[in-house]
Amino acid sequence: MTSAMPSSDIVKNKPSSEHIDIVNEVELKPRYDEANLDKFGAVIEIDPVEKALVKKIDLYMMPILWLMYFLNFLDRNAMINGKLNGLDKDLNMKGTEYNTCVSIFFVGYLVGQVPSNMILNRVKPSWYMSGCMLAWAIVSIFPILAKDYHGMFACRFVLGIVEAPFYPGAIYMISQFYTRKEAATRMAVFYTGNLLASSFAGLIAAGVFAGLDGKHGMQGWKWLFLIQGVVTVGVALLAFFTLPNSPLQTRWLTPDERQLAHNRIAIDTTEKREGTNVWKGLREACFDYRLWLFALMGNLHLSANGFKNFMPSVVQTLGFSTTITLVLTCPPYLLAAFASVAVSWSSGYFNERTWHITISKAVAIVGFIIGTATLNVGARYFAMCLFVGAVYGVNNINLAWTAATVGQTNEKKTVAIAIVNTLGNLSFVYTPYLWPDTDKPRFPMAMWASVGFSAGTVVIAWTLRFILSRDNKKIRAANPDAVNFYVY
């Protein structure tokens, strides 16, 4: 949030009644122009100087984060498309061994997230995030050396550990540079890296399998791991020089822009407090019960997204060839990319969370029900487009909502984001077992479970709406002049 005065004055003017003076984490509260604030205290229209700053951050930070996430998801999902090229048979996998290799990734992924975000708050994010990317790039190539289930199991577990820092770290970086009204849209744009990777992964795999399978004695799925890993190494080296650290420590911002970037986020944070140490941030986050509701909502939401690790196999049940199957995985994710950005933009524009989650989940529920209720090919593919297209905006809204609600200090915010993402991704440890091959083609257990998970997400969202509305009343009672309130 900013005051109604020009943003350039916030930085350049001498102290006055409207001057915002922030030195590190020490903030002197400004006087607000309430005509330019919504009911939660967020600025409705920012001035041209601040708009230019936001565009600059969009141009410099978002593309590299997006590309990193695109490759992050391509690398972890190479195994999923590899199954269509005989990966599981080449490694002599039996029973649920393939499903276990899918899920073990998330065990490593979960173990690393909270410690990683605690470290992130005390090191240079540009170095840390880029270094982690270089590590996962190298590890993602190792599966070409796997000889059996045990080798792939080890590769997937280690890959989960080295990929763990990226997503929660990137979400934290976005929350450091964008206000409540801006963050969800940027997170949605960032998340399209995931969606477009899911969309085009099948096309990339189809091309690799068709052109390189058997070349130089290597199966197509091994070429897929190798090519994607090498590209990721190159992008990791680029990221070392382009990622920012914090608003006050960003090489491609001028000194005035750095101060403005810091000020606008500090003022936009409800019940902002001075920084603390990472252990106190961990304690404060863990004792804020609202965090656990956000975490539960994230877990239920992502539990309904278990299809993402089996989408090629689900589409395959429509009865088409391997190449056509891989091509047909593309449109649902393209639709999801568009819908995710649209829903998140709307959530930010109207500064509203609950109804956006409710409507998205209602559409997804319809898709899950159709998907298991019929064997008609057209209807089932429509259902896939429906539930894939509808669900992805919810995660962006939840994480942006978490950062805005449980982010009174940077240390608390980093831990909160990591905990919500960790417990959310815990779902991917057990949801693979909801999609056994024996349930083809309807996958009734997975589809009906997803209906229940989606309904639970809506219940938690409305519970949070009630709680935050009550918290806002407490803020008004304690300070009748308060203008900054929790969004719901």
Question: What residue ranges belong to the model's regions?
Answer:
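Extracellular/periplasmic helix-loop-helix junction of adjacent transmembrane segments
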Residues: 80-112
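Extracytoplasmic gate region of multi-pass secondary transporters
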Residues: 80, 280-345, 355, 399, ...
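Conserved MFS/SLC helix-loop-helix module at the cytosolic interface between two early adjacent transmembrane helices
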Residues: 110-150
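Helix-breaking motifs and short loop linkers at transmembrane-helix boundaries and internal kinks
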Residues: 75, 91-92, 115, 123-124, ...
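Glycine-rich segments within core transmembrane alpha-helices of 12-TM secondary carriers
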Residues: 184-218, 225-232, 417-431
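Structural signature of the two symmetry-related core transmembrane helices
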Residues: 127-141, 355-370
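Helix-to-loop junctions at the C-terminal end of transmembrane segments
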Residues: 111-124, 338-352
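Intracellular terminal tails of multi-pass secondary transporters
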Residues: 1-71, 77, 95, 240-275, ...
